[in-house]
Curated annotation (Swiss-Prot):
It is found in: Cell membrane. It comes from the Bacteria. This is Uncharacterized membrane protein YteJ. The gene is yteJ. Residues 26-158 form the RDD domain. It is a multi-pass membrane protein. The chain crosses the membrane at residues 35-55, 66-86. InterPro entries: Pra-immunoreactive, RDD. The keyword Transmembrane helix applies. GO terms for cellular component: plasma membrane. Keywords: Cell membrane, Membrane, Transmembrane, Transmembrane helix.
Length: 164
């Protein structure tokens, strides 16, 4: 840089400028919806590749006569809940979120996802979201959080998309 002392004085440089703090962009309703549909397909595949053949080989009934819950439906529910809980705890994202470049983060700064947070978010949150209209909250929330996100202090963000 070629400048004279007088030119530098006239520019009135006060010191290094602060870098703008960039944060991850929140994931909206539709991208989360498509990620969930992809996860649902993965779980459907797991159940049809592992659980269904196991029940067939062991000659166990997949339905029960009088009761709402059969051993098969309970097993598929366990696969469903375990998939979301384990993937979120260990990878902060499910396969659907990986494909769409999303991840689950804690709202608290530099806070890791604890087992209690993940269990609540993914297990209890799945029951809250059974009332589909409650999931619409994601579309209208400024931080794009669902009811389960608000209660668990989490949110879903884009991995490689930032906002100022």
């Amino acid at each position: 840089m070629d400048a004279t002392y007088e030119e530098l004085e006239r520019n009135d440089i006060k010191g290094p400028q602060e870098a703008e703090l960039l944060t991850h962009a929140y994931a909206g309703f539709w991208v989360r919806f498509w990620a969930f549909l992809l996860d649902w397909l993965v779980i459907w595949g797991l159940n049809h590749l592992l659980v269904s053949p196991l029940f067939t080989v062991l000659d166990l009934p997949k339905t029960s006569g009088m009761f709402t819950f059969s051993a098969y439906s309970v097993t598929t529910l366990i696969v469903y809940l375990a998939y979301f809980a384990l993937m979120t705890k260990y990878f902060r994202q499910t396969l659907g979120k990986m494909v769409f470049g999303l991840k689950v983060v804690s709202v608290k700064q530099d806070s890791k996802l604890t087992w209690s947070t993940v269990i609540f978010r993914e297990v209890v949150g799945r029951y809250i979201d059974k009332i589909w209209i409650l999931y619409i909250v994601v579309a209208f929330s400024p931080t794009k959080q669902g009811i389960h996100d608000y209660i668990a202090d989490t949110t879903v963000v884009h991995e490689k998309l930032y906002r100022k």
